[in-house]
Protein backbone atom coordinates (compact mmCIF):
# COMPACT_ATOMS: atom_id res chain seq x y z
CA UNK A 1 0.00 0.00 0.00
CA UNK A 2 1.24 3.47 -0.84
CA UNK A 3 -0.52 5.27 2.03
CA UNK A 4 2.26 4.48 4.49
CA UNK A 5 4.89 6.53 2.68
CA UNK A 6 2.92 9.25 0.90
CA UNK A 7 3.33 12.64 2.54
CA UNK A 8 0.38 13.99 0.55
CA UNK A 9 -2.03 11.11 1.21
CA UNK A 10 -5.11 12.65 2.90
CA UNK A 11 -5.43 9.63 5.22
CA UNK A 12 -2.06 8.30 6.34
CA UNK A 13 -1.67 6.20 9.53
CA UNK A 14 2.00 7.19 9.71
CA UNK A 15 0.96 10.70 10.75
CA UNK A 16 -1.56 9.79 13.46
CA UNK A 17 0.85 11.09 16.13
CA UNK A 18 0.37 14.55 14.67
CA UNK A 19 -3.37 14.53 15.46
CA UNK A 20 -2.58 16.29 18.74
CA UNK A 21 -1.06 19.21 16.82
CA UNK A 22 -3.98 19.21 14.38
CA UNK A 23 -6.46 19.48 17.24
CA UNK A 24 -4.54 22.44 18.63
CA UNK A 25 -4.77 24.40 15.38
CA UNK A 26 -8.31 23.44 14.37
CA UNK A 27 -10.81 26.32 14.35
CA UNK A 28 -13.36 26.20 17.15
CA UNK A 29 -15.92 28.65 15.75
CA UNK A 30 -17.69 29.11 12.42
CA UNK A 31 -16.16 32.58 12.15
CA UNK A 32 -12.70 30.95 11.96
CA UNK A 33 -13.79 28.26 9.48
CA UNK A 34 -11.97 29.17 6.25
CA UNK A 35 -13.37 28.29 2.85
CA UNK A 36 -16.57 26.29 2.27
CA UNK A 37 -18.47 29.58 2.45
CA UNK A 38 -21.79 28.02 1.44
CA UNK A 39 -21.50 25.47 4.25
CA UNK A 40 -20.52 28.08 6.83
CA UNK A 41 -23.35 30.45 5.87
CA UNK A 42 -25.99 27.71 5.91
CA UNK A 43 -24.82 26.18 9.19
CA UNK A 44 -24.81 29.59 10.86
CA UNK A 45 -28.52 29.97 10.05
CA UNK A 46 -29.44 26.40 11.02
CA UNK A 47 -27.61 26.65 14.35
CA UNK A 48 -29.12 30.02 15.28
CA UNK A 49 -32.60 28.79 14.37
CA UNK A 50 -32.20 25.70 16.56
CA UNK A 51 -30.97 27.85 19.43
CA UNK A 52 -33.92 30.26 19.09
CA UNK A 53 -36.31 27.31 19.34
CA UNK A 54 -34.23 25.71 22.10
CA UNK A 55 -34.12 22.50 20.06
CA UNK A 56 -31.48 20.03 19.01
CA UNK A 57 -30.04 20.76 15.59
CA UNK A 58 -31.39 18.53 12.81
CA UNK A 59 -29.30 15.45 12.07
CA UNK A 60 -26.40 16.42 9.81
CA UNK A 61 -24.60 14.40 7.12
CA UNK A 62 -21.20 15.73 6.00
CA UNK A 63 -19.56 14.13 2.99
CA UNK A 64 -16.63 14.77 0.70
CA UNK A 65 -13.04 13.66 0.06
CA UNK A 66 -10.80 12.91 3.07
CA UNK A 67 -8.93 15.71 4.83
CA UNK A 68 -11.37 18.54 4.09
CA UNK A 69 -12.53 19.13 7.67
CA UNK A 70 -15.56 16.93 8.35
CA UNK A 71 -14.47 16.22 11.92
CA UNK A 72 -13.54 19.87 12.40
CA UNK A 73 -16.99 21.00 11.27
CA UNK A 74 -18.69 18.51 13.61
CA UNK A 75 -16.75 19.88 16.57
CA UNK A 76 -17.51 23.46 15.53
CA UNK A 77 -21.24 22.66 15.41
CA UNK A 78 -21.16 21.22 18.93
CA UNK A 79 -19.15 24.18 20.19
CA UNK A 80 -21.51 26.73 18.59
CA UNK A 81 -24.52 24.90 20.03
CA UNK A 82 -22.86 24.86 23.45
CA UNK A 83 -23.31 21.09 23.88
CA UNK A 84 -21.13 18.04 24.40
CA UNK A 85 -19.91 15.90 21.52
CA UNK A 86 -19.28 12.16 21.65
CA UNK A 87 -17.15 10.77 18.84
CA UNK A 88 -17.01 7.28 17.38
CA UNK A 89 -16.74 5.62 13.96
CA UNK A 90 -18.71 3.10 11.94
CA UNK A 91 -16.23 0.20 12.21
CA UNK A 92 -16.02 0.58 16.02
CA UNK A 93 -19.78 0.07 16.47
CA UNK A 94 -19.80 -3.68 15.93
CA UNK A 95 -22.93 -4.53 17.96
CA UNK A 96 -26.23 -2.80 18.61
CA UNK A 97 -25.26 -2.62 22.28
CA UNK A 98 -22.23 -0.47 21.41
CA UNK A 99 -24.50 2.17 19.89
CA UNK A 100 -27.09 1.85 22.66
CA UNK A 101 -24.43 2.56 25.28
CA UNK A 102 -23.50 5.81 23.53
CA UNK A 103 -27.09 6.93 22.96
CA UNK A 104 -28.22 6.35 26.54
CA UNK A 105 -25.36 8.49 27.85
CA UNK A 106 -26.24 11.54 25.75
CA UNK A 107 -27.65 14.63 27.42
CA UNK A 108 -30.29 16.90 25.92
CA UNK A 109 -29.26 18.40 22.54
CA UNK A 110 -25.84 16.69 22.64
CA UNK A 111 -24.03 15.73 19.43
CA UNK A 112 -23.12 12.15 18.51
CA UNK A 113 -20.50 12.15 15.76
CA UNK A 114 -20.04 8.96 13.74
CA UNK A 115 -17.13 9.05 11.31
CA UNK A 116 -17.12 6.62 8.38
CA UNK A 117 -20.85 6.17 8.91
CA UNK A 118 -21.11 4.25 5.63
CA UNK A 119 -19.34 1.36 7.39
CA UNK A 120 -22.08 0.78 9.98
CA UNK A 121 -23.31 -2.80 10.12
CA UNK A 122 -26.97 -3.38 9.12
CA UNK A 123 -27.76 -4.48 12.69
CA UNK A 124 -26.45 -1.25 14.19
CA UNK A 125 -28.12 0.81 11.48
CA UNK A 126 -31.52 -0.68 12.36
CA UNK A 127 -31.11 0.55 15.94
CA UNK A 128 -30.24 4.01 14.68
CA UNK A 129 -33.47 4.54 12.71
CA UNK A 130 -35.94 4.95 15.63
CA UNK A 131 -33.29 6.82 17.61
CA UNK A 132 -32.95 9.42 14.86
CA UNK A 133 -36.64 9.64 14.01
CA UNK A 134 -38.44 9.28 17.35
CA UNK A 135 -35.63 9.62 19.92
CA UNK A 136 -36.38 6.08 21.04
CA UNK A 137 -34.24 3.00 21.48
CA UNK A 138 -35.75 -0.41 20.69
CA UNK A 139 -33.92 -3.16 22.55
CA UNK A 140 -34.61 -6.89 22.41
CA UNK A 141 -34.49 -8.64 25.78
CA UNK A 142 -34.00 -12.39 25.90
CA UNK A 143 -33.82 -14.90 23.07
CA UNK A 144 -36.15 -17.15 21.12
CA UNK A 145 -39.89 -17.27 21.93
CA UNK A 146 -39.32 -15.45 25.22
CA UNK A 147 -37.67 -12.46 23.54
CA UNK A 148 -39.46 -9.15 23.90
CA UNK A 149 -38.86 -5.61 22.78
CA UNK A 150 -38.66 -2.68 25.18
CA UNK A 151 -38.53 1.00 24.27
CA UNK A 152 -36.25 3.48 25.99
CA UNK A 153 -36.84 7.20 25.53
CA UNK A 154 -33.79 9.22 24.56
CA UNK A 155 -33.20 12.95 25.00
CA UNK A 156 -33.30 15.01 21.80
CA UNK A 157 -29.86 14.83 20.19
CA UNK A 158 -28.07 15.58 16.93
CA UNK A 159 -26.43 12.81 14.94
CA UNK A 160 -23.61 14.04 12.72
CA UNK A 161 -22.43 11.46 10.23
CA UNK A 162 -19.29 11.87 8.14
CA UNK A 163 -18.37 9.87 5.08
CA UNK A 164 -16.17 9.93 2.01
CA UNK A 165 -18.71 7.69 0.24
CA UNK A 166 -22.18 9.19 0.45
CA UNK A 167 -23.33 6.82 -2.30
CA UNK A 168 -22.60 3.85 -0.05
CA UNK A 169 -25.17 4.93 2.53
CA UNK A 170 -28.49 3.10 2.43
CA UNK A 171 -31.46 5.22 1.38
CA UNK A 172 -33.30 4.80 4.74
CA UNK A 173 -30.29 6.15 6.62
CA UNK A 174 -29.52 8.95 4.18
CA UNK A 175 -33.16 10.12 4.17
CA UNK A 176 -33.18 10.57 7.95
CA UNK A 177 -30.64 13.40 7.83
CA UNK A 178 -32.38 16.78 7.83
CA UNK A 179 -29.23 18.63 6.73
CA UNK A 180 -26.71 17.46 4.14
CA UNK A 181 -23.44 19.29 3.47
CA UNK A 182 -20.85 18.46 0.84
CA UNK A 183 -17.32 19.72 1.39
CA UNK A 184 -15.40 20.65 -1.75
CA UNK A 185 -11.66 20.86 -2.39
CA UNK A 186 -10.37 24.22 -1.14
CA UNK A 187 -9.29 27.09 -3.37
CA UNK A 188 -5.67 28.22 -3.07
CA UNK A 189 -6.45 31.59 -1.36
CA UNK A 190 -8.50 29.80 1.31
CA UNK A 191 -5.72 27.25 1.83
CA UNK A 192 -3.21 30.08 2.11
CA UNK A 193 -5.29 31.60 4.91
CA UNK A 194 -5.44 28.21 6.64
CA UNK A 195 -1.66 27.76 6.38
CA UNK A 196 -1.04 31.27 7.70
CA UNK A 197 -3.43 30.72 10.61
CA UNK A 198 -1.77 27.39 11.45
CA UNK A 199 1.67 29.02 11.33
CA UNK A 200 0.47 31.71 13.73
CA UNK A 201 -0.98 29.06 16.08
CA UNK A 202 2.36 27.21 16.03
CA UNK A 203 4.31 30.43 16.63
CA UNK A 204 6.13 30.27 13.28
CA UNK A 205 7.63 33.19 11.39
CA UNK A 206 6.10 32.88 7.94
CA UNK A 207 5.71 35.25 5.02
CA UNK A 208 2.52 35.36 2.97
CA UNK A 209 4.46 34.09 -0.07
CA UNK A 210 5.69 31.11 1.95
CA UNK A 211 2.13 30.25 2.95
CA UNK A 212 1.07 30.57 -0.69
CA UNK A 213 3.80 28.15 -1.82
CA UNK A 214 2.57 25.53 0.67
CA UNK A 215 -1.06 26.13 -0.31
CA UNK A 216 -0.31 25.64 -4.02
CA UNK A 217 1.00 22.14 -3.40
CA UNK A 218 -1.55 20.97 -0.82
CA UNK A 219 -3.98 19.42 -3.33
CA UNK A 220 -6.88 21.55 -2.10
CA UNK A 221 -6.80 19.75 1.25
CA UNK A 222 -6.24 21.43 4.66
CA UNK A 223 -4.94 18.24 6.28
CA UNK A 224 -2.21 17.99 3.65
CA UNK A 225 -1.48 21.73 3.91
CA UNK A 226 -0.89 21.48 7.66
CA UNK A 227 1.27 18.38 7.22
CA UNK A 228 3.41 20.09 4.58
CA UNK A 229 3.68 23.15 6.82
CA UNK A 230 5.19 21.05 9.61
CA UNK A 231 7.76 19.54 7.26
CA UNK A 232 8.64 22.98 5.85
CA UNK A 233 9.06 24.16 9.43
CA UNK A 234 11.56 21.34 10.06
CA UNK A 235 13.51 22.31 6.94
CA UNK A 236 13.54 26.01 7.89
CA UNK A 237 14.80 25.27 11.39
CA UNK A 238 17.60 22.94 10.24
CA UNK A 239 18.67 24.58 6.97
CA UNK A 240 17.88 28.19 7.84
CA UNK A 241 16.99 30.46 10.71
CA UNK A 242 13.43 29.17 11.16
CA UNK A 243 11.87 31.90 9.02
CA UNK A 244 9.70 30.59 6.17
CA UNK A 245 9.72 32.56 2.92
CA UNK A 246 8.69 31.42 -0.57
CA UNK A 247 12.22 30.24 -1.42
CA UNK A 248 12.52 28.19 1.78
CA UNK A 249 9.11 26.59 1.22
CA UNK A 250 9.97 25.82 -2.41
CA UNK A 251 13.28 24.15 -1.51
CA UNK A 252 11.68 22.16 1.30
CA UNK A 253 8.81 20.89 -0.83
CA UNK A 254 11.10 20.02 -3.74
CA UNK A 255 13.23 18.03 -1.32
CA UNK A 256 10.04 16.22 -0.23
CA UNK A 257 9.34 15.40 -3.91
CA UNK A 258 6.10 17.40 -3.99
CA UNK A 259 6.05 19.34 -7.25
CA UNK A 260 4.42 22.64 -8.18
CA UNK A 261 1.04 20.97 -8.79
CA UNK A 262 1.10 18.97 -5.57
CA UNK A 263 1.98 15.72 -7.37
CA UNK A 264 4.26 13.18 -5.74
CA UNK A 265 6.03 10.20 -7.32
CA UNK A 266 2.88 8.03 -7.35
CA UNK A 267 0.83 10.65 -9.21
CA UNK A 268 3.61 11.02 -11.76
CA UNK A 269 4.02 7.26 -12.03
CA UNK A 270 0.32 6.78 -12.80
CA UNK A 271 0.08 9.55 -15.40
CA UNK A 272 3.36 8.61 -17.08
CA UNK A 273 2.27 4.96 -17.27
CA UNK A 274 -0.90 5.94 -19.12
CA UNK A 275 0.98 8.23 -21.51
CA UNK A 276 4.07 6.10 -22.16
CA UNK A 277 2.79 2.53 -21.84
CA UNK A 278 -0.76 2.89 -23.12
CA UNK A 279 -0.49 5.76 -25.59
CA UNK A 280 -2.50 8.08 -23.40
CA UNK A 281 -5.38 5.65 -22.99
CA UNK A 282 -8.06 4.61 -22.72
CA UNK A 283 -6.73 1.97 -20.35
CA UNK A 284 -8.72 -0.27 -18.02
CA UNK A 285 -8.28 -0.19 -14.26
CA UNK A 286 -6.93 -3.76 -14.12
CA UNK A 287 -4.18 -3.00 -16.65
CA UNK A 288 -3.31 0.26 -14.95
CA UNK A 289 -3.06 -1.42 -11.54
CA UNK A 290 -0.74 -4.08 -12.97
CA UNK A 291 1.38 -1.46 -14.76
CA UNK A 292 2.15 0.57 -11.63
CA UNK A 293 2.00 -2.29 -9.12
CA UNK A 294 -0.84 -0.87 -7.06
CA UNK A 295 -4.23 -2.06 -5.86
CA UNK A 296 -7.33 -1.02 -7.79
CA UNK A 297 -9.08 0.41 -4.72
CA UNK A 298 -6.05 2.58 -3.94
CA UNK A 299 -5.98 3.94 -7.48
CA UNK A 300 -9.70 4.74 -7.43
CA UNK A 301 -9.93 6.16 -3.90
CA UNK A 302 -6.51 7.73 -3.32
CA UNK A 303 -4.76 8.59 -6.59
CA UNK A 304 -7.47 9.40 -9.10
CA UNK A 305 -9.84 11.88 -7.38
CA UNK A 306 -7.41 14.81 -7.30
CA UNK A 307 -6.04 14.11 -10.79
CA UNK A 308 -9.57 14.03 -12.19
CA UNK A 309 -10.64 17.12 -10.25
CA UNK A 310 -7.66 19.05 -11.61
CA UNK A 311 -8.26 17.91 -15.19
CA UNK A 312 -5.21 15.66 -15.69
CA UNK A 313 -7.14 12.41 -15.95
CA UNK A 314 -10.52 11.36 -17.33
CA UNK A 315 -12.63 8.33 -16.49
CA UNK A 316 -14.59 7.10 -19.50
CA UNK A 317 -16.67 3.96 -20.16
CA UNK A 318 -13.69 2.58 -22.12
CA UNK A 319 -11.09 3.36 -19.44
CA UNK A 320 -8.78 6.09 -18.15
CA UNK A 321 -7.39 8.78 -20.45
CA UNK A 322 -4.53 11.22 -19.82
CA UNK A 323 -5.66 14.72 -20.83
CA UNK A 324 -3.83 17.38 -22.83
CA UNK A 325 -3.08 19.12 -19.54
CA UNK A 326 -1.16 16.04 -18.35
CA UNK A 327 0.95 15.99 -21.53
CA UNK A 328 1.66 19.70 -21.14
CA UNK A 329 2.67 19.31 -17.48
CA UNK A 330 5.26 16.65 -18.32
CA UNK A 331 6.40 18.27 -21.56
CA UNK A 332 5.48 15.20 -23.59
CA UNK A 333 4.22 15.50 -27.16
CA UNK A 334 0.97 13.70 -27.78
Swiss-Prot record:
Species whose genome carries this gene: Vibrio vulnificus (strain YJ016)
CDD domains for this protein: AAA
Name of this chain's protein: Holliday junction branch migration complex subunit RuvB
Domain of life of the organism encoding this protein: Bacteria
HAMAP family: DNA_HJ_migration_RuvB
Principal cellular location given in the protein's record: cytoplasm
Catalyzed reaction equations: ATP + H2O = ADP + phosphate + H(+)
Enzyme class: hydrolase
UniProt domain comment: Has 3 domains, the large (RuvB-L) and small ATPase (RuvB-S) domains and the C-terminal head (RuvB-H) domain. The head domain binds DNA, while the ATPase domains jointly bind ATP, ADP or are empty depending on the state of the subunit in the translocation cycle. During a single DNA translocation step the structure of each domain remains the same, but their relative positions change.
Binding positions (ATP): 25-26, 67, 70-72, 133-135, 176, 186, 223
GO CC terms, sorted: cytoplasm; Holliday junction resolvase complex
EC number of this enzyme: 3.6.4.-
